[in-house]
Amino acid sequence: MTQPFQRVLLVSKYHDPSVLPGLRQLRDFLLARDMPTFLESQSAADIGDSLGLPLLSFAEADAGSDLVIALGGDGTLLGTARQTAQSGIPILGINQGRLGFLADLSIHQISEALPPILEGHYQQDLRSILHAELWRSEERVHTGLAVNEVFIHKGGGESMIELQVQMDGRFVYTQRADGLIIATPTGSTAYAMSAGGPILTPTLAALLLVLICPHTLTARPLAVADSVEIVARLTASRQSAALSLDSHCSVPLEIGDEIVIRRASCAARFIHPEEENFFQILRGKLHWADSPGTD
């Protein structure tokens, strides 16, 4: 058992009024337990309602006593993780999206599953985060964090892009493809998995490089130590190309641009029910390793 949480900060999925019933249910449940409860400032501004709760920003939250509960889907949880990574505030995800692979609970489970967590009966893990910088003509023009993946990709046309990749200053390959995913272990069950990459356990100290539709039969996904610095240079493109971080932004690229990716010094801190394990989630949500003939 660890220290019980002293306050809860609620975060909602942005631009989605359908989360309001779930937020009200969470608010009522927490207040009935005399738990000091706040609504994240941007969430309140987005839904246009404070739900009668005091507002608190991520910057004002306390990593030593506060719990962030993010209500939404995986996108909400990823955005919350980027916001809290520097401070180390723990996050619990409650799914109100579709699959919700990263969110441990559904809104219907809170009465049973949430009290033990609030009282300190939980497990936690630190998830690595990627730091990406976009350099153009020796000038840094963009920087950001990614919990799942850094994605370098072609625009809307049919032509591939060409990328040259180096690792710690050593040449890895030059490939023509629709794109390149550099994923964390957390991101290995997202886009990288759909593109044929392997699944990594969440706390493994590794990164994945997965090409999207490469024009070759031999460039397989690559797992490397997360201590390396990866530099991907856009060497050719007949159309637009872009850089995306967790799919939440898209930055246009130009020929000669370099994207420098390394593990960030901060990490995402996720909270889970005590009885949960990663392989249970894989089986339950992705039907991983199902035996033939089983339901």
From Swiss-Prot:
User: Which one GO biological process term can you cite for this protein?
Assistant: NAD metabolic process
UniProt catalytic activity: NAD(+) + ATP = ADP + NADP(+) + H(+)
- Assigned keywords, A-Z: ATP-binding, Cytoplasm, Kinase, NAD, NADP, Nucleotide-binding, Transferase
Q: What is its EC number?
A: 2.7.1.23
Please tell me where NAD(+) binds in this chain.
Answer: D74, G75, N148, E149, R176, D178, T189, A190, Y191, A192, M193, S194
Record's Gene Ontology CC terms? cytoplasm
Question: Which residues participate directly in catalysis?
Answer: D74 (proton acceptor)
Similarity annotation = Belongs to the NAD kinase family.
> Which protein is depicted?
NAD kinase
Q: Which organism is it from?
A: Acidithiobacillus ferrooxidans (strain ATCC 23270 / DSM 14882 / CIP 104768 / NCIMB 8455) (Ferrobacillus ferrooxidans (strain ATCC 23270))
Question: What is this organism's lineage?
Answer: Bacteria, Pseudomonadati, Pseudomonadota, Acidithiobacillia, Acidithiobacillales
